[in-house]
Amino acid sequence: MSGRLILVRHGQSHGNVERRLDTRPPGAELTDLGVEQARDFARSRRNPPGLLLHSVARRAAQTATEIGTEFTIAPSEVDGIHEVQAGDLENRSDDDAIAEFNAVYQRWCEGELSIAMPGGESGSDVLSRYLPVLTDLRLRYLDDDDWTQDILLVSHGAAIRLASATLAGVESSFFLDHHLANTEAVVLVPITDGRWSCVQWGSRTPPFYPEPDVHPVEDALQAADPMG
């Protein structure tokens, strides 16, 4: 049986607490709670991963370090899996910025991937750097019949959701409405013909039904953490 690809959001960062659009690496560090979240995540796993990777962002590296310490595994940094780049909205925490970020993200979820964050990335930009990393991991490891361990990749909420839904065909209203809390994960399993199946999304398992009434901008404005 092939291993799985586990995409876990980093632990709580100071940027999350401050409700900042903190997307440009290296970015904010983990809070004390974020460190504990990373340790708890590792302790909740039954088996150690065969490979532990993280993005270039400081909060992802720190999360991976804590996980690696629990498993006595050295993490490695990977380019291309950092957060959606907010551009002109970077480091802002005002309602206008949060609303604009989530409005653009909603358009991506609805198929308008060419739309860009002001001064930042489009959905196509994000996928063009993120998906090749996952494809490479599949070809090098998961498609090998002798590889049976999971690959754990510490990344970022908005990027994880977009990439995972694209690969596994998760319905757009579902992934738009279901953010990932700190150290929650999406679990992908390789299936036939190069396709992927999503077997876990945060605390949820399939089927991932469409959400009839989603309000991502309003929800983000009310959320303690508008990212994820």
Give the positions of each predicted feature:
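Glycine-rich phosphate-binding loops at beta-strand->alpha-helix junctions
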Residues: R59, A159-I160
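Generic structural signal for well-ordered alpha-helical scaffold segments
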Residues: R39-R43, L127, L131-L142
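Acidic, low-complexity terminal tails and accessory targeting/binding regions
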Residues: M1-G3, V84-D96, D143-Q149, A165-G228
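Active-site signature of alpha/beta-hydrolase-fold catalytic machinery across serine-
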Residues: E66, L162-T166
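Active-site-proximal alpha-helix that buttresses catalytic centers in soluble enzyme cores
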Residues: G3, V8-I73
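Active-site metal-binding loops of divalent metal-dependent hydrolases
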Residues: G11, G157-A158
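Short glycine-rich phosphate-binding loop at a beta-alpha junction
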Residues: P49-V56, D145-V154
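Phosphate-handling substructures
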Residues: E29, T69-L131, Q200-G202, Y209-P216, ...
